[in-house]
């Protein structure tokens, strides 16, 4: 048996109430079908229909939301997975790699990882992330915990401020401040699936969405060997023990990635590049003709049988030939999407197979579609045109600024809950309303029951007589507020901000 054995990676056990005993191929497939049901029927997936892809608060149903984007990624992920399995079958390597009885789970894990890949994104996308992190940095100043003298620590939270002679506790304070100021959608996705939603998915399915392997509390440089894998936070301090168990169950070395995650990542890269351009045309940011010229000029030197001509040029010519029977827009994007998929999917599949030893070990330190090939150049072309002509458009930038202000404003509104003393907040949690804190009581009542219960569950397990208790209690209180606000849809966040700011509807 080769060292690559996917039976050691496609782990169908669960954290709680795990199936026991030896399972047949059909029984294992049923376990992953259960995962599919849990994911597709979860409220977090439904909320994606009102979260931003590129254009916030969009009323045009033809423009993509996070949900429609995720469904497209799911389809591309399935295509890549099938292509990989088909090629391995042709090479008679399925059995060698322990995949002969696991092709169904292999595909299902990829599909559901694709559907879930944006599940933790806050309202207004990356600008929502930036708003959360900026707001907490302005109060916790994690950089002061690294280099400044203790007397210069600007952290406004007394329990998190560094103290002389408390080095062990100071180390926890540093980790907590760093962690809270590095909210990230992928890390929040892990927290949603395990801690908040308690979906109890199989270890393999959760491994599929652990896209980045750097802890959110990481301080200092990352090793060159894992620079790509650790370029963003992948999980929080609150899920540290769960991720440690996940690594053990999936036989992952520290800071290594689950093999099927590379497929999910490639599917996302392929999907959003074309989709963002199509949505921009739908929004009349530019016409199809203008888009073609943007792409043509951005490609640079042109040759007759270049990848540009085979993909973009071919789509343009075919769409112009059918103008009498179909709209040029629809035709162009249909051909562009098909041409792009037909070139990039086989390439991504072959890259996966060619680099399988490193990918299986979880150490392949780049994306499948990130190399010096023309295929990567094509993806970069789409991305660069989107950056130059879509994301920089005044309408898009104005909406992003509004989104940033909404999230910052909501954090300002809920800030009184973070200003309460430990004892006062504990009493508020127990009694739910306190006459001496009318504003805080009303704000606390507005928090989601699911999020409040998650806070209570974890804090109740902390030893109250420990020196760490005030530090960790405040950490989980910050998580409570971040969980609530990041879980809102764009529209709900917008409406909630206007209601609480007493702005005319």
From Swiss-Prot:
E.C. numbers: 3.1.5.1
One Pfam match: HD
Entry superkingdom: Bacteria
Reaction catalysis annotation: dGTP + H2O = 2'-deoxyguanosine + triphosphate + H(+)
Biological role stated in the UniProt entry: dGTPase preferentially hydrolyzes dGTP over the other canonical NTPs.
Subunit structure comment from the entry: Homotetramer.
Name the record gives this protein: Deoxyguanosinetriphosphate triphosphohydrolase
Organism whose genome encodes this protein: Salmonella typhi
Phylogenetic placement of the source organism: Bacteria, Pseudomonadati, Pseudomonadota, Gammaproteobacteria, Enterobacterales
């Amino acid at each position: 048996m080769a060292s690559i054995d996917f039976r050691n990676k496609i782990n169908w056990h669960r954290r709680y109430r795990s199936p026991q005993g030896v399972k047949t191929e059909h029984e294992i497939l049923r376990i992953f079908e259960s995962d599919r049901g849990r994911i597709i029927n979860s409220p977090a997936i439904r909320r994606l229909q009102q979260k931003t892809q590129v254009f916030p608060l969009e009323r045009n149903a033809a423009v993509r939301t996070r949900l429609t984007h995720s469904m497209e990624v799911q389809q591309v992920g399935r295509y890549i997975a099938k292509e990989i399995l088909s090629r391995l079958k042709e090479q008679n390597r399925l059995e060698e790699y322990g995949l002969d009885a696991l092709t169904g789970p292999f595909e299902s894990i990829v599909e559901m990882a694709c559907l879930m890949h944006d599940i933790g994104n806050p309202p207004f996308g990356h600008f929502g992330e930036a708003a959360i992190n900026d707001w907490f940095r302005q109060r916790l100043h994690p950089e002061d915990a690294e280099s400044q003298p203790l007397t210069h620590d600007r952290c406004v939270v007394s329990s998190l401020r560094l103290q002389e002679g408390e080095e062990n506790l100071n180390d926890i304070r540093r980790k907590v401040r760093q962690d809270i100021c590095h909210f990230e959608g992928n890390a929040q996705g892990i927290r949603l699936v395990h801690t908040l939603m308690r979906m109890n998915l199989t270890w393999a399915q959760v491994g599929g969405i652990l896209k980045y392997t750097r802890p959110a509390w990481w301080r200092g440089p990352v090793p060159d060997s894992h620079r790509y894998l650790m370029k963003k936070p992948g999980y929080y301090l609150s899920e540290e023990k769960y991720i440690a168990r996940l690594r053990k169950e999936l036989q992952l070395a520290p800071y290594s990635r689950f093999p099927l995650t590379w497929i999910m990542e490639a599917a996302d890269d392929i999907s959003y590049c074309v989709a963002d351009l199509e949505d921009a045309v739908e929004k009349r940011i530019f016409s199809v003709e203008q888009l073609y010229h943007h792409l043509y000029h951005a490609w640079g030197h042109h040759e007759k049988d270049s990848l540009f001509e085979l993909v973009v040029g071919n789509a343009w010519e075919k769409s112009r030939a059918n103008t009498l029977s179909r709209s040029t827009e629809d035709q162009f994007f249909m051909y562009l999407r098909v041409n792009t998929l037909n070139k990039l999917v086989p390439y991504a599949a072959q890259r996966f197979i060619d680099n399988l030893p490193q990918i299986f070990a979880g150490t392949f330190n780049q994306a499948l579609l990130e190399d010096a090939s023309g295929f990567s150049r094509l993806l970069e072309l789409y991305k660069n045109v989107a950056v130059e002509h879509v994301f920089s458009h005044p309408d898009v930038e104005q909406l992003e600024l509004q989104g940033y202000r909404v999230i910052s404003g909501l954090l300002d509104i809920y800030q009184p809950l973070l200003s309460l003393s430990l004892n006062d907040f504990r009493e508020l949690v127990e009694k739910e309303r306190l006459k001496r804190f009318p504003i805080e009581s009303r704000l606390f009542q507005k928090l989601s029951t699911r999020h409040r219960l998650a806070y209570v569950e974890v804090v109740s397990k902390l030893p109250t007589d420990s020196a760490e208790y005030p530090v960790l209690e405040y950490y989980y209180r910050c998580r409570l507020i971040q969980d609530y606000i990041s879980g809102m849809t764009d529209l709900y966040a917008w409406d909630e901000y206007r209601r609480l700011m007493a702005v005319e509807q």
